[in-house]
Amino acid sequence: MAALCPYTGSETTSGIGLAAEGVTPAPIRYGVDRGGGELTGLMRSFWAETEFMLSAGQEGCSSVILSAPSWDESWAEWYGLVFPLLECSVLSAGLGRTLGIVCFHPDYSTPDAAYLARHRFGHMHSTERLRRWLAEADPPLSDRTDDSLLHWAGSYQRRSPHAMINVLWAEQLEVAETKRKSKVLYSRNVAKVLQAGLVELERQSALERTDRP
């Protein structure tokens, strides 16, 4: 994940390279949900970690990575229940302009454009949008990449050994988007993933899942 994010300097620090925009690199906080696969337990874990981040402020905590291993085998529920519930919870708390949420999963697969039009929160950009960006940024690569491979390359950017919720500062996300346009960043990441290759990356992912605690 850090290899695809230009602002994550290591597994412990994020916000790298944004000092000119007023962002101070700060620690990444890691947490683990022990809710046993229950939505109520997951939400308690999410808000406990988020409250720590809010209390620490941007200089004390750059982001939160909350692992939820009990949800590793429940991709359908992860995007069908957890994503929408997180959205409602954050918006109900009046923090929609304060926090950015990104969700990861071992089996992440970007939903279709129709679903994303209703439930964009936390998801990867649609394959259709990635196609437009890639066609602008790297026409030759776009021409030789079919839709199924592009969908995989986009989905792979949200794969992780465990189900995971990444909590970020919305203000810092906006600064990052201003510094590096989305179409450039995501096209670069698609190229990296495609260069590594589907077979090799899926092999590495399988090993990560085997080794996870």
Could you describe each region identified by the protein language model?
Residues M1-P213:
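Expand to "…catalyze enediolate/carbanion chemistry for C-C bond making/breaking, isomerization
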